[in-house]
């Protein structure tokens, strides 16, 4: 198939146009014509939208993928990445056997990658861990996981790390993208994840995008918004960003604001609502309470960093009891004039925006993604968004609500719901709550006190701890942090190459991370294994294994469970723990955690022709079903109810809580949510008093801003054709050809000032590192003067050499959207 860039973009535009016109691509006709191809369903491997894909296999290979016409999410459509899913597993450089750095027949950190057996790989890993545990606390061994990990894999990891090896140093790459959203949900509602669903799109009058380029990052949802905008009466779209991108093409109100000023804009909107008597007092009085946040909370940098001095970093997450009058006073400072001064947004646009939120007749949905979350005040800005929806009662009902969109296919279903964060357990439970720990130990049949109650090193702290020698073993799975993590020059790379440390990367390809590791483990991808994802609207979707992985590739699930056989309880648990459960003495962690009478009690069905399950063949039981049902027991009866495992293989996903076989579309609202009692109307039942929190916090400046030397803002992100670090998409010929290399987008005036022209080779320089790229002053992204935009998919241009590892001090999520940079001709 030959596809030039112009045809490629026209094709994608045609897909969006077809969606806007209500046309369904005739997938089933295509399917019927392909004789000899077996078709089955699976959720897409990429973003958090959760599109369902029909996967065509023949002769042991995936040969085609099509949008699933029976799926409610995407209705037969796929974005351009989804249409080429069949090719992601067949790059020429698949890693097909374990590779260890060796010299003279033994491990050497400076040696060359040498093929070894799985037994050799697991033996050296186990030896390293056991040696560390003899000298240090368990948090010195770590895992870096992913929002792309399946539900089963994530749950197995949590069990092995927190219960088996007794380390809370397990964190996902979702720390970099969804932590602020998750923490804000918990602080506001006492429960994680959105209350609404995608059905809001067809019921809303107004859509406001904050830091979200849905046209390229969630194109199928964007096609539904486009359809609603073009076919509905008086439907409006507002797009807000620090630069102009493709979503602006549909915007009725396009708004460009200065970095970090979204804080001031949201406080202005809250002030406008109050000053113009648009507060829904009935809702506010019944269903909310007020708190004030800690201020001057720092930037999540190393404690010795100058920006951390004199701050309230240690109490950053505190919320103090407050009332409406104090909240009113906090936001009253943010007048139209002040919001304009801080944000640079014209006053008429600010007022138009505020009126939309304040108008009780307008159904309004707010969408946001990384522009909001990757923010040194990401938790605050998320909570500010909830403030304006709570003040107006525009929440938890059809067509109204705040909606945090996830960027990965199971950032919700695995990272958040399963709990692969340093502080979490399944179903919103946390390791710092003794009751939650006791519940987990009961379900897992553990001695009391097995699960440690001190969180380990979070994602950014892992890099620092590796560099400092406090973390000595790291196993990275299903992610590429050496390319995707922040400040890799100063923090990440030194820790990975620290001779005290041993780094393992499970990866299907020789990614930037893999080639920096000590041991590479070949991993299965997507439908080479059985899996499950949870998307942004709480929809859980499962799929069956459809082909085998190449060579000696094994799923991450197989790797975790098989590796557990290399440890006996006597080697990793204290005598005090073993005395409580003497029957566990001498047993492997595999026997205690997985072959434990619960996880191993199911067998794979034999009545499905052609159905394969490599894990069941190896372990002798239906591992995925056993893990799922045990995991589901955490949430059933607690507002996180999942349907029985087998049900999910018969449907295109269900949105939890699923009670009595019925999914929940709008949480917390009577008539939709089975946990809201008759007469309550709305109950935010994650909090003991059923009330949501409205939080008063101010605008605070970013960690780093342009100055005389580093005179531009740097914002990083993605493009339509590629996903994250490009490990998969750059190996799809059509996608690589359409967008082969990273670019830097700059305003023509800024280019002229620097003697630069479109297409020039340029060098980007920050206080942390530099990178060579090419300049684009005419393309799809149009930046304002003073700001440049670039992406991170290109392994040949390591953008994260430039970025600052400042984080939100409450969520520890990284701010990739703003630091100071200078650009010169290369």
UniProtKB/Swiss-Prot annotation:
Positions annotated to bind [4Fe-4S] cluster: 44, 47, 51, 79
SUPFAM superfamilies with a match to the protein in the record: ADC-like, Formate dehydrogenase/DMSO reductase, domains 1-3
Ligand binding (substrate): 792
Enzyme Commission (EC) number: 1.9.6.1
Reaction equation(s) it catalyzes: 2 Fe(II)-[cytochrome] + nitrate + 2 H(+) = 2 Fe(III)-[cytochrome] + nitrite + H2O
Cofactor note: Binds 1 [4Fe-4S] cluster. Binds 1 molybdenum-bis(molybdopterin guanine dinucleotide) (Mo-bis-MGD) cofactor per subunit.
Gene Ontology molecular function terms on file: 4 iron, 4 sulfur cluster binding; electron transfer activity; iron ion binding; molybdenum ion binding; molybdopterin cofactor binding; nitrate reductase (cytochrome) activity
Keywords: 4Fe-4S, Electron transport, Iron, Iron-sulfur, Metal-binding, Molybdenum, Nitrate assimilation, Oxidoreductase, Periplasm, Signal, Transport
Annotated coiled-coil segments of the chain: none
Domain 4Fe-4S Mo/W bis-MGD-type as annotated: residue spans: 37-93
Subcellular location: Periplasm
Statement: the UniProt record of this protein carries the keyword Heme: no
Cofactor requirements of the protein: [4Fe-4S] cluster; Mo-bis(molybdopterin guanine dinucleotide)
Post-translational modification: Predicted to be exported by the Tat system. The position of the signal peptide cleavage has not been experimentally proven.
Annotated positions binding Mo-bis(molybdopterin guanine dinucleotide): 81, 148, 173, 177, 210-217, 241-245, 260-262, 370, 374, 480, 506-507, 529, 556, 716-725, 800, 817
InterPro entries registered for this protein in UniProt: Asp_de-COase-like_dom_sf, CT_Nitrate-R-NapA-like, MoPterin_dinucl-bd_dom, Mopterin_OxRdtase, Mopterin_OxRdtase_4Fe-4S_dom, MopterinOxRdtase_cofactor_BS, Periplasm_NO3_reductase_lsu, Prok_molybdopt-oxidoreductase
GO CC annotation: membrane; nitrate reductase complex; periplasmic space
GO biological process terms held by the UniProt record: cellular respiration; Mo-molybdopterin cofactor biosynthetic process; nitrate assimilation
Stretch forming the signal peptide: 1-32
Assembly and binders: Component of the periplasmic nitrate reductase NapAB complex composed of NapA and NapB.
Protein function: Catalytic subunit of the periplasmic nitrate reductase complex NapAB. Receives electrons from NapB and catalyzes the reduction of nitrate to nitrite.
Family: Belongs to the prokaryotic molybdopterin-containing oxidoreductase family. NasA/NapA/NarB subfamily.
Entry protein name: Periplasmic nitrate reductase
């Amino acid at each position: 198939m030959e596809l030039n860039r112009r045809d490629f973009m026209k094709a994608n535009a045609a897909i969006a146009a077809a969606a806007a016109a209500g046309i369904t691509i005739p997938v089933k006709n295509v399917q019927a014509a392909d004789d000899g191809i077996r078709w089955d369903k699976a959720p897409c491997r990429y973003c958090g939208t959760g599109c369902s894909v029909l996967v065509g296999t023949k002769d042991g290979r995936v040969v085609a993928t099509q949008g699933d016409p029976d799926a409610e999410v995407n209705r037969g459509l796929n974005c351009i990445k989804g249409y080429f899913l069949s090719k992601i597993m067949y790059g020429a450089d698949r890693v097909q056997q374990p590779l260890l750095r060796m010299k003279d027949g033994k491990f050497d950190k400076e040696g060359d990658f040498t093929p070894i057996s799985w037994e050799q790989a697991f033996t050296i890993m186990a030896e390293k861990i056991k040696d560390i545990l003899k000298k240090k606390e368990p948090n010195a061994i770590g895992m870096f996981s992913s929002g792309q990990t399946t539900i089963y894999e994530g749950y197995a990891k949590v069990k092995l790390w927190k219960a088996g090896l007794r380390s809370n140093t397990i964190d996902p790459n979702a720390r970099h993208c969804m932590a602020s959203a998750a923490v804000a949900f918990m602080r506001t509602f006492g429960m994680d994840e959105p209350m609404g669903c995608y059905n809001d799109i067809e019921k809303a009058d107004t859509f406001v995008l904050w830091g979200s380029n849905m046209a390229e990052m969630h194109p199928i949802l964007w096609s539904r918004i486009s359809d609603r905008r073009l076919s509905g009466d008086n439907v409006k779209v507002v797009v807000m960003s620090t630069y102009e991108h493709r979503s602006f093409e549909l915007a009725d109100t396009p708004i460009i604001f200065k970095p970090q000023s979204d804080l001031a804009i949201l406080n202005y909107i809250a002030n406008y609502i109050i000053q113009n008597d648009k507060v829904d007092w009935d809702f506010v009085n019944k269903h909310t309470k007020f708190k004030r946040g800690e201020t001057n909370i720092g930037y999540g940098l190393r404690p010795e960093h100058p920006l951390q001095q004199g701050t309230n970093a240690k109490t950053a997450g505190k919320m103090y009891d407050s009332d409406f009058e104090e909240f009113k006073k906090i936001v009253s400072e943010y007048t139209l004039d002040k919001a304009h001064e801080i944000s640079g947004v014209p006053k008429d646009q600010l007022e138009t925006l505020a009126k939309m939120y304040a108008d009780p007749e307008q159904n309004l949905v707010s969408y946001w993604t990384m522009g909001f979350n990757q923010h040194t005040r990401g938790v605050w800005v998320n909570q500010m968004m909830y403030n304006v929806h709570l003040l107006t009662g525009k929440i938890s009902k059809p067509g109204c609500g705040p909606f945090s969109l996830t960027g990965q296919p199971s950032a919700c279903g695995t990272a958040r719901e399963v709990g692969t964060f340093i502080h979490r357990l399944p179903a919103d439970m946390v390791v710092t709550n003794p009751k939650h720990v006791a519940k987990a130990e009961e379900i897992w049949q553990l001695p009391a006190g097995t699960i440690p109650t001190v969180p380990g090193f979070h994602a950014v702290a892992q890099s620092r701890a590796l560099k400092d020698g406090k973390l000595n073993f790291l196993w990275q799975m299903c992610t590429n942090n050496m390319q995707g993590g922040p400040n890799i020059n100063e923090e990440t790379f030194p820790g990975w190459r620290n001779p005290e440390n041993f780094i393992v990367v499970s990866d299907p390809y020789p990614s930037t991370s893999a080639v920096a590791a000590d041991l590479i483990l070949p991993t299965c991808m997507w439908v080479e294994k059985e899996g499950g994802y949870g998307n942004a609207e709480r929809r859980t979707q499962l799929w069956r294994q459809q082909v085998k992985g190449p060579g000696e590739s094994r799923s991450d699930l197989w790797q975790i469970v098989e590796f557990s056989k290399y440890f006996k309880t006597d080697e990793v648990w204290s005598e005090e723990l073993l005395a409580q459960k003497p029957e566990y003495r001498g047993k492997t962690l595999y026997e205690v955690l997985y072959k434990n009478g619960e996880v191993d009690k199911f067998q794979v069905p034999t009545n499905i022709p052609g159905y394969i399950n490599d894990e069941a063949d190896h372990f002798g039981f239906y591992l995925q079903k056993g893990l799922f049902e045990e995991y589901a027991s955490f949430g059933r009866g607690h507002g996180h109810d999942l349907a029985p495992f087998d049900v999910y293989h018969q449907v295109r996903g269900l949105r939890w809580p699923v009670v009595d076989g019925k999914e929940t579309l709008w949480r917390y609202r009577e008539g939709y949510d089975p946990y809201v009692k008759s007469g309550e109307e709305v109950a935010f039942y994650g909090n003991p008093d059923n009330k949501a929190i409205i939080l008063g916090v101010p605008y605070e400046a970013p960690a780093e801003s342009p100055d005389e030397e580093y005179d531009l803002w740097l914002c990083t992100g993605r493009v339509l054709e590629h996903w994250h670090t490009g490990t998969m998409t750059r190996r799809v010929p059509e996608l690589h050809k359409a967008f082969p290399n990273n670019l830097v987008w700059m305003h023509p005036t800024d280019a002229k000032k620097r003697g630069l022209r479109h297409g020039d080779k340029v060098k980007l320089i920050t206080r942390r590192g530099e990178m060579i790229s090419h300049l684009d002053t005419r393309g799809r992204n149009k930046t304002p003067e003073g700001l440049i935009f670039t992406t991170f998919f290109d392994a040949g241009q390591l953008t994260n050499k430039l970025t600052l590892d400042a984080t939100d001090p409450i969520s520890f999520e990284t701010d990739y959207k703003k630091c100071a940079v200078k650009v010169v001709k290369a």
